[in-house]
């Protein structure tokens, strides 16, 4: 199946491109659960080259539906059948008539709506925040806690929720705020969760980037049991489990989770690679602790980049190191 995917992907840029053969390959990949993600990736690439599919727009639209990328039905196609419109109505979110779920978002939303505890491992582009907003949009939950890793993200989340739900919920985002409403959403870092004594009778709590509950391994091979942020997050989790009826943990690249069942907290674990963007991944094979090789690769990558480029770093310290190296190499200067 990988060979079919690679051939179709490379053919998209070829002069003798056949849109029918490309969509035939997409259909074959989408029809097999093992290769479903590859088929969806090809659909995203096809939508980025719409002009090459002008002769088979209807087939492309049907493949978009088959891939579960329902938001693109509304965004990319003007000629929609009554059946297409019914699909859009079914997957429309409770908080906005203009926002449509894709199939994985709807699946997670449906699990949470039914009262199940959910642990979700998914890429950033899956749109996990829209699921929380949809639960709020239903209006059935009164008290929620959203635990986010940074103050900056708490402020960003607070602004979004204030704009959408400020008329219905009190949005609490810092330690000194007094809760004066029966309907409240706490948007806090783990430290601020632990500082408050009014977090009780919670309908649902959400922890973003829950993988940070685990202590990290040092370069020496030892486990860093002194990381205060990890300790604070575990204390916050313990506190919230005792006062909440339901939980939703989200994060990327987690294959399994242990311990919650033994503690008496049944949950549904969902691990998905559902991406709404197409990615071309190049692997350099650099060891995790080989900083010299990483900086060398950084120079090679920066030299090859001609458009605006985003570099993701795991910490402010690493971001500073990368910035200094780029400046030394002459990038980002007039």
Regions found by a protein language model. Give the residues of each.
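N-terminal helicase ATP-binding lobe
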Residues: 1-334
């Amino acid at each position: 199946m990988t060979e079919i995917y690679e051939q179709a992907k490379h053919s998209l840029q070829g002069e003798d491109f056949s849109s029918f053969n490309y969509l035939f390959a997409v259909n074959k990949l989408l029809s097999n659960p093992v290769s479903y993600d590859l088929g969806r990736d090809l659909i995203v690439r096809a939508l980025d080259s719409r002009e090459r599919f002008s002769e088979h727009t209807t087939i492309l639209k049907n493949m978009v539906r088959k891939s579960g990328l329902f938001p693109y039905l509304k965004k990319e196609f003007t000629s929609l059948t009554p059946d297409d419109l019914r699909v859009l109505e079914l997957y429309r979110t409770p908080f906005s008539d203009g926002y449509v779920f894709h199939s994985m978002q709807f699946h997670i939303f449906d699990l949470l709506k039914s009262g199940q505890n959910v642990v979700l491992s998914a890429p950033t582009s899956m749109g996990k925040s829209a699921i929380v907003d949809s639960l709020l949009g239903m209006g059935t939950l009164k008290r929620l806690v959203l635990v986010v890793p940074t103050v900056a993200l708490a402020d960003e989340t607070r602004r979004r929720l204030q704009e959408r739900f400020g008329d219905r919920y009190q949005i609490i985002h810092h330690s000194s705020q007094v809760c004066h409403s029966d309907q409240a959403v706490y948007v806090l870092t783990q430290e601020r969760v632990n500082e408050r004594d009014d977090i009780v009778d919670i309908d649902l709590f959400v922890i973003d980037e829950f993988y940070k509950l685990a202590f990290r391994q040092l370069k020496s091979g030892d486990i860093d049991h002194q990381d205060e942020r990890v300790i604070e997050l575990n204390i916050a989790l313990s506190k919230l489990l005792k006062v909440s009826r339901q939980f939703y943990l989200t994060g990327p690249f987690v294959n399994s989770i242990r311990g919650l069942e033994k503690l008496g907290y049944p949950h549904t674990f969902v691990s998905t690679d559902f991406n709404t963007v197409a990615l071309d991944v190049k692997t350099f094979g650099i060891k995790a602790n080989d900083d010299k090789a990483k900086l060398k690769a950084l120079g090679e990558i920066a030299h090859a980049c001609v458009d605006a480029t985003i570099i993701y770093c795991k910490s402010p310290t690493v971001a500073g190191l990368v910035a200094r190296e780029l400046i030394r190499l002459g990038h980002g200067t007039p």
